[in-house]
Amino acid sequence: MLEKDFQRTLIQDLKQRFPGALIFKNESRQGLPDLTVLYKDKWALLECKASKDASHRPNQDYYIDRANEMSFASFVYPENKGDVLNALEQAFRTHRKTRFSKSE
């Protein structure tokens, strides 16, 4: 599956799981994550990959790590999509941060 196809299905899943969420596709400059998700008073950054073994661009690890310290951020690919969505759902429900390990 191509990354753009995976991203499209992920966006559909996010809209279904988080009704009313604002989902923005970010410019792919400087390694910024692909998606910003705003839901109620929470936010998340998600970097889509076609597979677990897909390469990372410069700065992607930095931005995911920094954003995860502030809120929720993760690399997401077909092999971990369910786990990431479950962790994101938990993070959006709680008043404290829920972190998901980027290297699973």
Regions found by a protein language model. Give the residues of each.
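Catalytic phosphate/metal-binding cores of nucleic-acid and nucleotide-processing enzymes, i.e., regions
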Residues: M1-E104
